[in-house]
Swiss-Prot record:
It comes from the Bacteria. The lineage of its organism: Bacteria, Pseudomonadati, Pseudomonadota, Betaproteobacteria, Burkholderiales. This is UvrABC system protein C. The UvrABC repair system catalyzes the recognition and processing of DNA lesions. UvrC both incises the 5' and 3' sides of the lesion. The N-terminal half is responsible for the 3' incision and the C-terminal half is responsible for the 5' incision. Residues 22-100 form the GIY-YIG domain. The gene is uvrC. Belongs to the UvrC family. The keyword rRNA processing does not apply. It is found in: Cytoplasm.
Length: 682
């Protein structure tokens, strides 16, 4: 693809229209401040741009946009496909007010098998490379972790980081509960581990029956050689795999990789629900809510939608023909026009989603859609980019139809939930969940814990942990931790200590629950395991920047916890509220949300509560320490007499205010000692 020809023309509408070519390309409208208003593509730039200035019946909002245009830039391209690609890139980069815009989720989760001698299985976000194996993308972090748990149970691949793997001298707890074959200590050969890795990869690719057949052959071979222990191990592996396949029976279809896209519009908002099928397994879905929809759809309703040919939808059975309006009676024609208008809204949104979500990313061979996208060029460009034909299925049958129906229902539910949450604390929770790519059907279950360290010049160091759950702060679950055994003022050591103390026991409880279930022959997650796992938070906020987050990452790695839940809250310039930056432990780029962000409002609320709780605890501890230290300095007053004085007068202040006679009335305090105490305190 050659570089397109670009031009910037001073804004004089008549001159601009006269100079525009009858060629495909992209146009951009700017206001007087230089802010981009709209980005569009056209197969004929002259006709398309002229329509904004020559059409007499424009809607008020379109007319308002046209009056704000102060500059037009155009870029000529060789083809409509090239224009489509450039348009998508510009929309992502410029976020124009009048374009439909989806949040750019560059950190879609994958399951990664590393290129190590003993490959590690890991949750991964970010760009993929050719060195490691990647499976996905997955619709949510939960789907990745569920797959990892399945592979641990069936194939027992390692999940520890290489730094931990290289320094192990004995098997970890995962080996003891049958979740890892302990290659770190040579408990399995290179060849056998490689077979497990190959089987796991084929399982993820949807070739489960092939894996099961090979395991059965392997079991019989061991039995024929009288290697009954090895045969029993393979039998157990087959049993675990059979259990998994049985649990997923309703999810598995003949398709290997399919994406299902359902679009629903209601109450001025639009939801696109994306469901993913990978390796024949339905992995769940994710709801997307585009911004700038109202402005963009006003353009479409005003007759200025893009000049496109509908994309052709295909399936094993023929689709219903496209409805027309011309040959219908007047009343039916009016109704059909209304339906067509509504359909165009969803088609425009679907076009925007497909372009912004798939261009530049992996595309499955089949997209099942609730509405036919407006642009055929888009489908052709996706196929060219993917290196294989990408088919759109508009009216699916069988299992695909059930998947689409479920996606549409989930889109309606997600949209209804969003509308009910707007303007409330639930809206803040939703905003934070979307910002951090946390997926859950019930945000009330979202548990956030936040940590803060407080001290005065290294004195009375104390850490606080506050909890946000069910859309509110849970004060009964707040905890304070006295930090000891560190260099005064060492916040990093304090953070390491509190995180270790907080989560080490939780990890042990979860492991013990799994071990008990394993011994009892219970497959899957029991109530015992669920209760142990529910104690762990979904998001952990750290009041601090990169240094504190790195310490937290080290602790979580040592404990085997997911580092993607760690979020640092770094203070902005001058420590002003609204200028904070979110720092991540899993390699994601730092994020600045801005003062008006509902997500940042919730983060600040939780962070400030942690700070308040830490400060009050630190002050109380410091005051108590200072009181105790003054009494400890009194000559002739040991531990027992000190306790009696505190019990009688309630603290240092009461002892200081007491007279000699009152001091002498305390058991074990003579009149002479009372006078001595009085003189030392005054």
């Amino acid at each position: 693809m050659t570089s397109p020809e670009a031009s910037a023309i001073p804004f004089e509408p008549k001159k601009i229209l006269a100079q525009l070519p009858h060629m495909p390309g992209v146009y951009r409208y700017y206001d007087t401040a230089g802010a981009v208003l709209y980005v569009g593509k056209a197969r004929d730039l002259k006709k398309r741009v002229s329509s904004y200035f020559t059409k007499t019946q424009l809607s008020p909002r379109i007319a308002m946009m046209v009056t704000r245009i102060a500059r037009i830039e155009t870029t000529v391209t060789r083809s409509e496909a090239e224009a489509l690609l450039l348009e998508n890139n510009l929309i992502k980069a410029l976020a124009p007010r009048y374009n439909i815009l989806f949040r750019d989720d560059k950190s879609y989760p994958y399951l990664k098998l590393t290129a190590h001698r003993f490959p590690r299985m890991a949750y991964y976000r970010g760009s993929v490379d050719k060195q490691n194996q990647y499976f996905g993308p997955f619709p949510s972090a939960w789907a990745v972790r569920e797959s990892i748990q399945i592979l641990q149970r069936v194939f027992q691949l390692r999940t520890c980081e290489d730094s931990v793997f290289n320094n192990r001298t004995r098997p970890c707890l995962l080996h003891q509960i049958g979740r890892c074959t302990a290659p770190c200590v040579g408990a399995i050969s290179d060849e056998d581990y490689a077979v497990d890795v190959s089987n796991a990869a084929r399982f993820l690719l949807g070739r489960q029956s092939e894996v099961m057949k090979e395991l059965e052959q392997k079991m019989h071979a061991f039995a024929a050689e009288l290697k009954f222990e090895q045969a029993a191990a393979v039998r157990n592996q087959m049993s675990s795999l059979a259990t998994v396949l049985h649990q997923q029976a309703i999810e598995v279809g003949s398709d290997s990789d399919v994406d299902i896209l359902a679009v629903v519009a209601q109450g001025g908002r639009v939801c696109v629900n994306l469901a993913m099928v990978r390796g024949g397994r339905h992995l769940g879905d994710k709801a997307y809510f585009p911004t700038h929809v109202e402005s963009a759809l006003t353009l479409a309703e005003g007759g200025l939608g893009e000049e496109v040919e509908p994309a052709e939808a295909v399936d094993a059975t023929a689709d219903a023909p496209v409805d027309t309006v011309a040959d219908q009676p007047a009343e039916e024609a009016g109704s059909a026009r209304g339906a067509a208008s509504a359909a165009s809204v969803e088609a425009e949104v679907l076009d925007a989603f497909i372009a912004q979500h798939y261009l530049g990313n992996r595309v499955p061979p089949v997209l099942v859609v609730s509405h036919a996208p407006a642009s055929r060029d888009l489908l052709e460009l996706l196929s060219e980019q993917a290196g294989h034909k990408v088919s759109l299925v508009r009216q699916p049958q069988g299992q695909r139809r059930a998947w689409l129906s479920m996606a549409e229902q989930n889109a309606r539910l997600a949209l209804a939930r969003l509308l009910s949450e707007q303007g409330s604390q639930q809206a803040r929770t939703r905003a934070l969940a979307d910002t951090l790519s946390y997926d859950s059907d019930d945000l009330a279950t979202l548990r956030i814990e936040c940590f803060d360290i407080s001290h005065t010049m290294g004195e009375a160091t104390q850490a606080s942990c506050v909890v946000y759950h069910h859309h509110k702060m849970q004060s009964s679950e707040y905890r304070r931790y006295n930090i000891t055994g560190i260099t005064p003022g060492d916040d990093y050591a304090a953070m390491r200590q509190v995180l270790t103390r907080r989560y080490e026991k939780m990890v042990e409880q979860a492991a013990q629950a799994a071990a008990v279930d394993e011994a009892a022959g219970i497959d899957g997650e029991s109530t015992r395991q669920a209760e142990a796992s529910s104690l762990l938070p979904n998001i952990v906020l750290i009041d601090g920047g990169k240094g504190q987050v790195e310490i937290a990452r080290q602790v979580f790695t040592e404990l085997g916890l997911d580092t993607s839940m760690l979020v640092g809250v770094a203070k902005g310039e001058g420590r002003k509220v609204g200028l904070e930056t979110l720092v991540f432990a899993d390699g994601r780029a730092p994020l600045e949300l801005g003062k008006e962000s509902a997500a940042l409002m919730l983060v600040a609320q939780i962070r400030d509560e942690a700070h308040r709780f830490a400060i009050t605890g630190m002050r109380a501890k410091r005051a108590k320490a200072r009181q105790t230290s003054r009494l400890e300095e009194l000559e002739g007053v040991g531990a027992k007499r000190r306790q009696r004085l505190l019990a009688r007068f309630g603290g240092l202040r009461g002892v200081v205010a007491a007279s000699v006679e009152e001091l002498a009335s305390v058991e074990g305090i003579s009149h002479a000692l009372a006078e001595q105490i009085y003189k030392q305190l005054h």
